[in-house]
Structure formats: structure tokens, C-alpha cells
């Protein structure tokens, strides 16, 4: 029915892709392809019942709040925010959505995967005994970099390369590794209270690769004391080619071990 993007080039290219898709007969938005920073408002106000928020996540809290104010059901891709202020805004908007009876879905597909659901249930039912530690990884290759185009503003360049700027992306832990962290939190039925870690840029440090790190290593503690008895989650995420790759979650128990993914 309608679609939009901050950049007109992106909006038009995506419309062309959908129009050439095998389900092209379902695409009926030729006159409702919007662009500009306010494109989300035009899409939401175009007469839709549900809106899919799949832009770079730095905009997500503002887009979600407007959709809820206009009474729309929402599917939004993870992550839902990139910082504390955005997260608090999102939580307040979600209270409004619940009060209005609106349906809200988030792109944590593992939560809906029958294999994950069954594995998590078995671990929680004691299949490997008491969980004593967790490991999770999103170690893989470096994402795309889109070159600057002549006449492109700095804002347009950053939106086009949103993954490499923290105000739009939130960095690797927030943008991708959140999938694996969510699985561990789901298994534990809790959130870590303490964390310590390190990160930096060893390979991805050129002038066109922004400010996000290419590796992080974090130790999370499910408990209130660093030195007390607690379950610890060891987390690794990295974008460096030619080294160990894994996108996975693992649970170590008092009676066994589970590869969750």
C-alpha cells in the first residue's frame, strides 16, 4: 500500500525490487512511495492498518511512537533503540500501545523457531542440570560499505552507511549480537546485572568505516555481586575476515552441555 525511506534513491530502488518480485501483484504503492526524514509519517498516515518499521534503528523509537499515536499495529525490526533515552521512550510508547490494544511484534525470529523453543524448554526443565555458564557468538565477516557519491551530504552518507555510525546503529552488540544475548536471557529468564568487557578496531579502521568497533568481548553476570556465586555469560562478536566464525549460543550445565542454535 505504501512505503518510504529517508533517501529517495533507496525508496525507488526498493519499490523496483518489490515490483519485480514473484509476488509483484501484491505491490500496489506506485503513487505512495515517499522519501525524506518525514517519510515515516506519510506512510503511517496513508491509510494503513499495520506498519513495518525496518529502517536503521536510530530512528525506531520516534517512528514507533508516531505509529502508536496514530493507532497502528506494528512490526519492528530489532534493535528497537540504540541508547538509553531511546529505550525509555520505547517503553513508554509500548505502554500506550497496550492501553490501545495494539499488536506489536519484534524481529527476534529465534523466539518463534520451534527448535529453539523446544531446546530452551528442555534446558529449563533440567536436561543438562543447573546452568552454570553460557557462551554466545556473532563472529563473522565485515558488512557492506557503500562509497560516497558526488554531491552527497554528510547526513545522506551516514544514513546510507548507517551500520558504521553509533547514533544510527548502536554498534555490533546492539545491532546483531542482540539476537544471541536475547537467547541467553530467554533461557535464564533474567537479565545480567553486571558486565565488563573490551573492544576496538583492528582491521576496520579506514576513513570510510565510521566509528563502530570490529570486535567486542564481554563477560556478563546474572547476579548482583561480581565475586559471588553466579551464572556468567561469555559473549563475543566480531567482524574480521579469515578467522574463527560462529553465530551460536551454548549452555553448560552441572550434568551436560547444550548447543542451543
Q: Predicted regions span which residues?
A:
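Beta-strand-loop-alpha-helix segment that lines the small-molecule cofactor/substrate pocket
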Residues: 49-50, 57, 61-112, 126
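Predominantly a Rossmann-like dinucleotide-binding segment in NAD(P)-dependent oxidoreductases
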Residues: 100-105, 110-210, 224-228, 241-250, ...
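Solvent-exposed loop/turn segments at secondary-structure junctions
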Residues: 6-10, 40-41, 57-59, 81-83, ...
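Structural recognition of the beta-strand scaffold that forms the well-ordered cores
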Residues: 1-5, 32-35, 52-54, 75-76, ...
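Short, solvent-exposed loop/turn and secondary-structure capping segments
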Residues: 13-17, 62-66, 86-87, 116-117, ...
Amino acid at each position: 500500500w505504501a512505503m518510504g525511506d529517508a533517501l529517495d534513491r533507496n525508496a525507488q530502488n526498493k519499490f523496483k525490487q518489490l515490483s519485480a518480485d514473484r509476488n509483484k501483484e501484491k505491490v500496489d504503492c506506485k503513487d505512495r512511495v515517499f522519501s525524506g526524514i518525514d517519510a515515516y509519517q506519510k506512510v503511517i498516515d496513508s491509510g494503513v492498518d499495520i506498519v513495518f518499521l525496518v529502517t536503521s534503528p536510530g530512528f525506531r523509537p520516534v517512528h514507533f511512537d508516531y505509529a502508536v499515536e496514530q493507532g497502528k499495529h506494528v512490526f519492528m525490526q530489532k534493535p528497537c533503540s540504540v541508547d538509553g533515552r531511546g529505550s525509555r521512550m520505547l517503553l513508554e510508547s509500548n505502554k500506550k500501545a497496550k492501553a490501545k490494544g495494539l499488536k506489536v511484534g519484534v524481529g527476534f525470529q529465534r523466539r518463534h523457531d520451534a527448535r529453539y523453543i523446544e531446546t530452551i524448554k528442555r534446558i529449563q526443565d533440567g536436561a543438562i542440570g543447573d546452568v552454570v555458564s553460557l557462551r554466545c557468538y556473532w563472529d563473522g565477516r565485515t558488512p557492506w560499505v557503500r562509497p560516497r557519491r558526488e554531491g552527497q551530504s554528510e547526513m545522506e552518507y551516514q544514513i546510507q552507511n548507517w551500520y558504521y555510525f553509533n547514533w544510527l546503529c548502536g554498534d555490533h552488540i546492539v545491532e546483531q549480537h542482540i539476537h544471541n544475548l536475547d537467547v541467553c536471557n530467554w533461557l535464564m529468564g533474567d537479565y545480567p546485572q553486571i558486565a565488563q568487557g573490551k573492544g576496538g578496531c583492528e582491521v576496520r579502521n579506514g576513513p570510510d568505516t565510521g566509528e563502530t568497533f570490529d570486535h567486542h568481548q564481554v563477560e556478563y553476570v546474572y547476579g548482583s555481586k561480581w565475586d559471588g556465586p553466579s551464572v556468567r555469560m561469555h559473549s563475543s562478536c566480531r567482524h574480521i575476515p579469515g578467522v574463527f566464525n560462529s553465530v551460536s549460543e551454548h549452555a553448560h550445565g552441572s550434568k551436560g552441555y547444550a548447543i542451543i542454535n
